[in-house]
Amino acid sequence: MIWHVQNENFILDSTRIFMKAFHLLLFDGSLIFPECILIFGLILLLMIDSTSDQKDIPWLYFISSTSLVMSITALLFRWREEPMISFSGNFQTNNFNEIFQFLILLCSTLCIPLSVEYIECTEMAITEFLLFVLTATLGGMFLCGANDLITIFVAPECFSLCSYLLSGYTKKDVRSNEATMKYLLMGGASSSILVHGFSWLYGSSGGEIELQEIVNGLINTQMYNSPGISIALIFITVGIGFKLSPAPSHQWTPDVYEGSPTPVVAFLSVTSKVAASASATRIFDIPFYFSSNEWHLLLEILAILSMILGNLIAITQTSMKRMLAYSSIGQIGYVIIGIIVGDSNDGYASMITYMLFYISMNLGTFACIVLFGLRTGTDNIRDYAGLYTKDPFLALSLALCLLSLGGLPPLAGFFGKLYLFWCGWQAGLYFLVLIGLLTSVVSIYYYLKIIKLLMTGRNQEITPHVRNYRRSPLRSNNSIELSMIVCVIASTIPGISMNPIIAIAQDSLF
């Protein structure tokens, strides 16, 4: 009898939960339509993989790419609509969040063709790879629109779990296993630190979890200047710092970059920074509104350390992927300048503009590395010597992307940095801007050192890897070359037509 009553209660509770979930999806589902497209794509991938043989592999790529493109299209159709809060305050839709979601979708769309031939050559499992990429993209999109502490924690965990699995995708590689273990342990520790910071914020605000309600709660409890808020700020900064990987939270980055499959590194190097930047701007700007001086100081310290350490240590690297890892640490220092400037003086607009260019520059560089690695099997910088004599197209593409990363005119990277530094100068961040300019000069040095190797390697310097290099013809429909061409063009031409891009960024935010 007791069991019968308990069983009935369980059925009633389950029915209520299901009906509530259905009600939320029915009335709020249109506000997450781009995310729903990705979920449908994930389900379709699983269905096709479980009901077909290996001959349908092209369909898997087609479905993944199509779902990403359709999600981008849905975002563009929803552009400039009024801000909306859905799912009982857990998710917010506005132009600011959507522009970061667009950048994440753009990263994933470019990374899939970048990975096709690599997966086929290394005989990796294709379906799981695509599932992890789409799920990580989904987690990043939800993080961009997260409006409460629970969603801000769960969404990046969804992204992080997929990142751990992707970084250890080549199970037989010892370096990949080592990178995954370090990534997992440090990721778990940072998540614990982040949750601890959230608990201080939750308690200080009187039990509120929505970002704007936390501000109101801090006013009601008169705790906005309390030591508890300072403790919360420190713990949350450390937790978010792992996702952004500025110094000194950068220890995992070089090892993960070196040990993980190169297409995975390309994906993680851009999507994690875009999603974490979107989350950081909202967390620092809303709940810590009354502690702006404190978090400005913390971020300034992180930016200075990142720009100096990242660019100086990159000079000494012999691995191309480790060099780009330290370069990315320096690049995030520039992005932090835009976060500090904020709404005033176009700080967010300059940050978004630079991130758009950084995506094309970084993915273009990684496309060249993937192509060179598949044809030679090496990642050593010295082995790039004399590549221009064997493959001028690849050498020129890599040189353009590296020059754009360094910030040389008239490439996109130069104008992106110029706009970012100008906004920082107008906001009074003179010391940060000067450090940024000096470290940019340092970065140009190690980029030019690689370009010199590419173009002027003498016969005695050319390694057997390049001497035996075989270039595949362009007519082979190489998907990596397609991604590389798109990224090289995006790293070059937008610098000439900068004003429309800046106008779009400003118009979408303000």
From Swiss-Prot:
Principal localisation: plastid
**Disulfide-bond pairs as recorded:** none
GO CC terms, sorted = chloroplast thylakoid membrane
Known catalysed reaction(s)?
a plastoquinone + NADH + (n+1) H(+)(in) = a plastoquinol + NAD(+) + n H(+)(out); a plastoquinone + NADPH + (n+1) H(+)(in) = a plastoquinol + NADP(+) + n H(+)(out)
Q: Does the keyword Nucleotide-binding apply?
A: no
| Recorded superkingdom | Eukaryota
Q: Name one GO molecular function term.
A: NADH dehydrogenase (ubiquinone) activity
Q: How does it assemble?
A: NDH is composed of at least 16 different subunits, 5 of which are encoded in the nucleus.
Designated name of the protein: NAD(P)H-quinone oxidoreductase subunit 2 A, chloroplastic
| Gene behind this protein | ndhB1
